[in-house]
Amino acid sequence: MTRTRTALIGAGFISASHIEGLKAAAPEVEIAAIVDRNRALAEGKAKQFAIPGVYGDIEEMIAAGGIDVAHVLAPPDAHAAVAGRLLAAGIDVFLEKPMATSVADCEALIASAAGLGRVLGVNQNFVFHPTYRAARRILIDQRRLGPIRSLHVTFSVPLRQLGARQFGHWMFQKPVNILLEQAVHPLSQIVDLLGPPAAITARAAAPLQLAPGLTFQDRWTADLACGDTPVQLYLAFGQRFHAWRFTAICDDGLLVCDLSAGRVMVQGRAQWPEFLDNLVVGAGMAGHIAGQSIGGAAGYLTGLLKLRPKSDGFFVSMRDSIKAFYAGLPSRTAPLDGCFGAALVQICETMAGAVPAPAASRRPAAVEPAALNPDLVVFGGTGFIGAHLISRLVAAGRRVRVVSRAADSLLPPFDSPLVEIMRGNVAKREDVERALAGATVAVNLAHGGGGADWEEIKRTMVGSALMVAECAKAAGIARLVHVGSIAGLYLGDPAEVVTGSTPPDPEAESRALYARGKAEADRALFAFAAGSGLGLVILRPGLVVGAGTAALHGGLGFFNNEQHVIGWNEGTNALPFVLVEDVADAIILALDAPNVEGKAYNLVGDVRPTAREFVGLIAQATRRPIAFHPQYVQWLHAAELFKWGIKRATGKSVDPPSKRDLISRGLRAQFDCGDAKRDLGWRPVADRDLFIARAVDVHRAPFERAA
């Protein structure tokens, strides 16, 4: 039997889910190739999952031949072009949601697939979510509650990109995009249950004002008429509490399908008198909910221990969606075909039509390096610290070149005529060399990337920092300001006073990967600068807070959810907070300060609340019941050892947890930043009320609503 050879078009985060789903659902399928314009990303995935073919574009893959099926995981606005080319090349296509960004594109793909005799399927995997499937069996297959008379759907979910202010993401570019990106999940279940709606009435709340020229439609309501069944839909994006559920009211009971909790609740009737019926039905419902909750926890743990196949809802939905697609290939059909995908896009287009088109926002275009002749280059300048830095540089009238991988979707301050946006990747030497051409000073805010093991961290975090320094020296850069982190220091001794001359942790190899990477990057940079004569200054900010980042910093503890902060210790020691504005000021000062080459400076402000105090301030400002839970390092270490033991039992090769790292995360050491104040002329905010206004009060309402 000839094996089906499959290619993945796109090596982003969802590709791993497709690979795992393919291996579980269709082990007879050979994952033969992976394609991505970022070839290094594709090579990394190929190495991780033993995929033999790696290509930089689909034309290269098509020319090589031998591919039967392609999973299109490219950005949504590329779906139509990529899928159309693959179909024309005689390749069956499995499209990630949304099918395309317009009904016209969907119809063109449907016609192309039909004319060429190819299979076109859409991955609306939440139609295969086990909780939804359980509800569907009760409502449709078994008809246990009679006809569905009304359906009420709530989809109120967090949105990571909104909290991280990643406004360059495709979903923020126009109102329909968030619907295509997120709303298709609940819509797919509505259409699967009741069919496409014949009529739609939609409304949207006043949008959030994310930035000058950019609004975001975060709340929607819609009435859909699906046959004789009315559907009420509520959508909210960027919410604190994850609530995804639907209630089906039927002739003989109601069903609540809670996708967030993985539970289905059925309320019916028994044969008893009403007072007794309520008791019997209520007790049965309680027992059923408890049983589902226990079963879900048991399934997760046994799956984690590999005592049974992996069974979390998302994985199962991906596995079963992929399985259904491949099961249909012999008959040349797809369970969720182009018509299904097009119906969802049609609903999104209709809903978006209820919202006035936003005014065109001013966006900078990527330009060639010689356009402004700036003497200052900033790598990683579009992040949290970078945005504040660029704002201050622009306010001072300084011309600056910002290197960004998303050069076509930036907002103020990056639209200033003093800012040159250059598309580039700090991991690519040729991009770094091109960016530094003609400059005299540079700032490196880019962290370089992460990794699952030390070799990858050394390549991304340490290697990229060193490569920027090497390119800076070769380009004749007079001063390179590298922005690292206090994480590379050992900060667990309450008796130690830490200054800029305190060296990186001498036992960094015993620390967690991030801390070790920061420590080794500092060491490598100092060694290179000493040997080459590069004018290097290293700045190590503390816990950076302020407008534009999450309210709760990871230096406070870790979070099983954002309402509960599990402290790194008892939470009674002063923490090394610093305002983002003060960090930006220090970077600018370090560009020109005399006699600072070859030195490091820690950036910690003069207002230093404890973890308990800071969490309490945030809770008060946001009017939310956020709690700090003090811990002892011994307990934390024991818990980490337990988790490490589980990973080892499942065959994972992982290093044991470092108690030294946990102690250091408590940040008990004392910081003396007198050297930064003396040498740089740095003056961080010392007024407690002003600190609270900038670090805490800004989170009362991160975004205003547009008029």
Regions found by a protein language model. Give the residues of each.
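N-terminal Rossmann NAD(P)H-binding glycine-rich loop of SDR-like oxidoreductase domains
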Residues: 11, 374-396
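Predominantly a Rossmann-like dinucleotide-binding segment in NAD(P)-dependent oxidoreductases
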Residues: 127-203, 208-212, 525, 557-561
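Beta-loop-alpha module in the N-terminal Rossmann-like domain of NAD(P)-dependent dehydrogenases
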Residues: 18, 53-110
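Conserved Rossmann-fold NAD(P)-dependent oxidoreductase catalytic core, especially the SDR/UDP-sugar
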Residues: 123, 463-514
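NAD(P)H-binding glycine-rich loop region in Rossmannoid oxidoreductase-like domains
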Residues: 415-463
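Amphipathic terminal alpha-helices
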Residues: 346-375, 671-679, 683-707
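NAD(P)-cofactor binding segment of oxidoreductase domains
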Residues: 84, 103-104, 441-442, 452-482
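Contiguous beta-strand/loop segments that form the cofactor/metal-binding neighborhood of enzyme cores
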Residues: 187-273, 311, 317-332, 349-350, ...
